[in-house]
Amino acid sequence: MSHLDCHVYYDSTRQTAPPAECGDRVDLAADPGAAGHLARLGLSAADLPAVVMTEPDGKIRIVGVRLSAEETTLLATGHGIHSGSVVVYSSSWCPDCRRAKRVLEEAEAPFAEVDIDQDHAAEVMVLERSGGRRVVPTLRFDDRVWAFNPAPPLLRRLLNGRAKVQPRPTKEKAE
């Protein structure tokens, strides 16, 4: 997750400031205008503290809400999360969805699946949380952390290292 830019939104009148290693800290008490960015993701002050991790071009990859101070630090510093449930929002035609499900299976992480081509409410929710993009796969962890088309290494980190790494095939030398 080190290639992602991390923004931690909090309200200093209700939460302590996150540690500096968490990245860009945005205090809504000091910068009320920042609430507009959260509103575009369907988030409000009730969802704070919130972690938003983006690509350098601004594409949102991870959103975490209602996190404890420890969870905020772990997620923001790339140490993954502990979750009890995972839901994969996918489409049947999507190769990235199949890859994400394979990583979850390798990690022995049980998950439910929702096809957003068949479930309009799920599609609307993905659009809302991703800032208006129809991103598949979208993964929801315990209804508090969302990952948008995470590459396998990022997904493994989110799973807190639970994914089993498959050994790479080695080329045998011809004798």
Segments from the language model and where they lie:
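Extended, hydrophobic interaction surfaces within ordered domains
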Residues: 1, 5-76
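Local sequence-structure signature of Cys/Sec-based thiol-disulfide redox active-site neighborhoods
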Residues: 1-25, 79-112
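Short phosphate-engaging motifs
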Residues: 15, 33, 96, 122, ...
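Small/polar loops that bind or transfer phosphate-bearing groups
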Residues: 26, 64, 89, 114, ...
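Thioredoxin-like thiol-disulfide oxidoreductase module
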Residues: 26-47, 115-134, 140, 159, ...
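Secondary-structure transition/capping residues
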Residues: 49, 82-83, 137, 166
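Non-catalytic, surface beta->alpha helical segment in thiol-disulfide oxidoreductase systems
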Residues: 54-80, 141-175
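Conserved small-residue-rich
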Residues: 84-142, 150
